[in-house]
Swiss-Prot record:
Belongs to the Tom40 family. Channel-forming protein essential for import of protein precursors into mitochondria. Specifically required for nnt-1 accumulation in the mitochondria and may be involved in the secretion of daf-28/insulin from the mitochondria. Required for embryonic and larval development. Forms part of the preprotein translocase complex of the outer mitochondrial membrane (TOM complex). Interacts with mitochondrial targeting sequences. The gene is tomm-40. This is Mitochondrial import receptor subunit TOM40 homolog. Residues 1-20 are annotated as: Disordered. GO terms for cellular component: mitochondrial outer membrane translocase complex; pore complex. InterPro entries: Porin_dom_sf, Porin_Euk/Tom40, Tom40. Pfam families: Porin_3. It comes from the Eukaryota. It is a multi-pass membrane protein. It is found in: Mitochondrion outer membrane.
């Protein structure tokens, strides 16, 4: 295996790079609403051009409390709106903390994630990617426990075959004493086709099928369709979503419904052109279970 050269740590990522394997379905998923329940107040405050903090107060039956978050963006500019390193973190009053560190050195990109729950390390993950001219190679180590001999290893490869077609593969390997046989591995394959106004992506493996379709009708209207089939439990769900924007009115609406007869939506309205106040309304309804949830939020900053 060739060792990285000094020029590779300084070279920019080529424009023809297909991106990360984990972002295959991201474009369609961005259309889907992120619904919430209860009342939420979020205040974002930029302390400098590189440092920002946030305060979030939530009131709901499932989650009531306060969270503090901080974001730092470094000075290493690698794109028009992309700079590294990036440090993200948030914590609540009980000390439950999540943190993420992102850094890019030339064609190499690293990501470190950690989570602390009730004073104990609940999860840790490290990822490194090599982004070449036409391909991305990634390796992830998750929850590696040297004492109990357990952990998860994920290898990913994404290759650009034509300007519109990308193909890839992923291998997930998990080992541990609580796994039948001591270890298990799952291999899956993926493809993505990008056209002028739509993106279609597919992931196929022994555990199931994941299909997404993104369609941009025009600048302010987009649709997303997702099909997920889990072969292990014998379930399949299809979800249709849309996102529409009215920039002049400061309005963004996202909504979705699926084959389980669940409907959800998030409506966001900028209250003032001079002040950074945004009102968010969220609602979900399952017609089969006759269960619904409602949320209201105010975002400042």
């Amino acid at each position: 295996m060739a060792t990285p050269t000094e020029s590779e740590f300084a070279a920019p990522i080529p424009q023809t790079n297909p991106g990360s394997y984990e972002e295959l379905h991201r474009k369609a998923r961005d259309v889907f609403p992120t619904c919430f329940e209860g009342a939420k107040l979020m205040v974002n405050k930029g302390l400098s051009s590189h440092f920002q903090v946030s305060h979030t107060l939530s009131l709901s039956a499932m989650n009531t409390g306060y969270r503090f978050g901080a974001t730092y963006v470094g000075t290493n500019q690698v794109g028009p709106a992309e700079a590294y390193p990036i440090l993200l973190g948030d914590t609540d009053v009980n000390g439950n903390t999540t943190a993420t560190i992102l850094h890019q050195m030339g064609i190499y990109r690293t990501k470190l994630q950690g989570q602390i729950q009730q004073g104990k390390l609940a999860g840790a993950q490290a990822t490194i990617e090599r982004k070449g001219r036409l391909s991305t190679l990634g390796l992830t180590l998750a929850n590696i426990d040297l004492v109990n001999e357990a952990g998860i290893l994920v290898g990913q490869f994404l290759r650009r075959l034509t300007p519109r077609l990308d193909v890839g593969t992923e291998m997930v390997y998990q080992y541990g004493k609580n796994i039948p046989g001591g270890q298990i591995s799952v291999l899956s394959y993926a493809a993505r086709y990008t056209a002028n106004h739509f993106i279609a992506a597919a992931t196929l493996g022994a555990s199931g099928v994941h299909l997404t379709y993104y369609h941009k009708q025009h600048d302010n209207l987009a649709f997303g369709v997702e099909f997920e089939c889990n072969a292990n439990v014998g379930e399949a769900v299809t979800t249709l979503a849309y996102q529409t924007e009215l920039p002049e009115e400061g309005v963004t609406m996202r909504a979705s419904f699926d084959t389980n007869w669940s409907v959800g939506g998030v409506f966001e309205k900028r209250l003032s052109q001079q002040l950074p106040f945004t009102l968010a309304l969220s609602g979900t309804l399952n017609h089969v279970k006759a269960a619904g949830k409602f949320g209201i939020g105010l975002i400042i900053g």
